[in-house]
Structure formats: C-alpha cells, structure tokens
Amino acid sequence: MTRAEAFSEREVAMCTVAHLIEDGRTYWAAGGGTPLYAVLLGQKLYAPDAQYVTEDGVISPEPLLPFEPMMTMVASRAVHHALQWGTMNSAGGHAQLGHMDYGVLNTLQVDQHGNINSTF
C-alpha cells in the first residue's frame, strides 16, 4: 500500500469538517457529495451519536456502505434504516423550527430570496 502524499482540496475540506462534527448534534447535509461524506466520516470517527438529515428530507439514515452520495441520495442503499423519509420542504421546516443544530452546505446556487438550487 502506498502512502498518500498529496490530498485534494475536497479531501482536506471533508476531513476538516469531519473534525467539527459533534456528538449528539443534528446536521443538515445539503448538496450531497462532500457535505455528506464529511458528516459520515465525522460520525464514524469522532461522533457516533451525531445525526443528520439529507437535503431531500431523509432523517437519520444508516447508509449501506459503500455508496456514492451524489448518485444515490434517495436510493435504498443511502437511506437504509432511516427514521423518516420526508421531503425537501419538511427538511427546511425542521430547520426553521430549530430541530437542526448545523447545516453543512456544498457548492450550490442561492438566489436573492434565499432559495437553494442544488440540482446537478
């Protein structure tokens, strides 16, 4: 096995965010990809009791690994054992009611009214 000597900016960002994940907190992983990887890594390594909600409203899934978050956001492998399958509107509603502690956002487009366009 070779030793990695260089890391991409994406990998550094994921590891940095993973270190910030706190036990017992709820995270909104919006945008898939890097935010979801970071939350899963933080949950696995540092904060096993951290929970997360995906941008499409799936609450506390236990994904079957391996899976590719960008391609399987609502696939059965990604939302295994979820507490609830909601919608993007329900995820936003939970956040507005204060049921989420932090949001981890990916690169996306936000218009002047605060609407998020995270399509790909």
Residue ranges and their predicted role:
Residues M1-F120:
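Conserved alpha/beta enzyme-core scaffold
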